[in-house]
């Protein structure tokens, strides 16, 4: 027999960002409990609104599956006397397991012959287990932040008000905090707050909707999407697409109603990003554009209540937005009274980080780095890069960014343009913050790219230098994102640069701030970057062992490293690869980091030695040419031609000859071979 398990946790409004993860955790926890408890089930579904988390499991078995267990007992020598009669040890073991001595088995083990007993343990009914299981699940749901309330010794994202727990339509009785489980749920807080009985998921979903609660977030999202399309169509505009906001709003309401509002045309003189930030980030409004993508003085808000006349909702939201935009207009006018560059000195009074100094000091450091990068890579943009770096953080001292911190970079760009700065400088002020998230937009210009790399490497080296290193759970300075950003920018722009040199230069500029030895910091930073690069490449589907092999060989130049990874990954698909990898591994193992590659042909004792030497000389020039061109697949194919002569050497002579001079010469020959392919990858890391 199987039945449905239903659980609803009713709460105060839980933050929208908590709910998708909570749904996933709820499913994970019930699966783990049922599987660990040997209780069969079919499907698990979870739902959430701001005021409830819901779980439904179908096909739940009525009891635990039977389990055959084996218990070990005393050794045979202890269990039986010299005449073969059971001792107290054997009798006690049999009695404790509810069997006769004759039911005990003798088995040979590493320690000798021992007694064992196998028996079938009947499972407990599911109905008995659930009152223990469900409170454990509720307590185990992890939230980024949780709270306590009243004088209760429990924590949850928000205070809990009711619990519905049913198995096969019957209440699963348990207490949690000051609540007792039952079969009563509650409707929408304002539109239908009364209780209603629950008997099953199907009945619950229907009854909840009658009480103005759309429990399924997927359904709510679709309803909102449909309403947005309908409402925006009335004003002749187009919805500014925003799937992330749609996902969030779906968890902000239980019964959505889209409402169109507007604001004065005069506010359209403000930068579009500013208007969108105020509406989207602060009010969770959807923005409206015309056919050309230009913002219209309209917005759409999603209300949590429906009414015949939503004018009051519209007017209330317009009033709130008008106040926000009025503040923005004030800051816009005030900030423009002075030039952006005049704010640079004010950064001397802004602490970037207590041990790393002021924001002004940081700007001076990364300006030096950015200019040097420009000199190395694109000399013609040196002056633009220096100017952009100087202005990059000046908007932090504006009233607008103080009020709307999300607009850092955006306002710097806008104010720079108004001040008559070169458009590439203005663009770089914005772009040096890119990318703002994994897979996000990258700087589209060298000027912004240089400032971005310099700013980010200064942050990483500085934080590592004073012991502010990310942990598994904390990365307050977003150093992982910065590292990934640096690597992506380098790859996107194709810059050929040395990461060790960049890190060393950055640490040199930070010298008086460091609280750790610079050599240790450099090693930690480079390993941090290497791990980020490894994760980036494997996430793209490149084989783990190939990426590891390449990055273990050399990671100085990310562009070169990526070319080597792609070359080796392609070479791996060719028929000779496995045999070649085995041969190369053997070479690496026998030379063990040897450095002497001076070979004396006069010491050769067999044709196979001369054969390998000649083959090595024949391929070296072509190999080095392919490497210089970044044609690593061709380089690997070329060095692959050495497999046969290397194998012949291993078969024809004993490398570790008793003659020390001959042995050294053979090792030097193999070291010269290893030197070629080890510059591409460490083949000992390849799974072959």
UniProtKB/Swiss-Prot annotation:
Its main location: cytoplasm. Its EC number is 6.1.1.14. GO terms for cellular component: cytosol. It catalyses: tRNA(Gly) + glycine + ATP = glycyl-tRNA(Gly) + AMP + diphosphate. SUPFAM superfamilies: HD-domain/PDEase-like. Transmembrane segments: none annotated. GO terms for biological process: glycyl-tRNA aminoacylation. Keywords: Aminoacyl-tRNA synthetase, ATP-binding, Cytoplasm, Ligase, Nucleotide-binding, Protein biosynthesis. It comes from the Bacteria. One of its GO terms (molecular function) is glycine-tRNA ligase activity. It is found in: Cytoplasm. Tetramer of two alpha and two beta subunits. Belongs to the class-II aminoacyl-tRNA synthetase family. HAMAP family: Gly_tRNA_synth_beta (MF_00255). This is Glycine--tRNA ligase beta subunit.
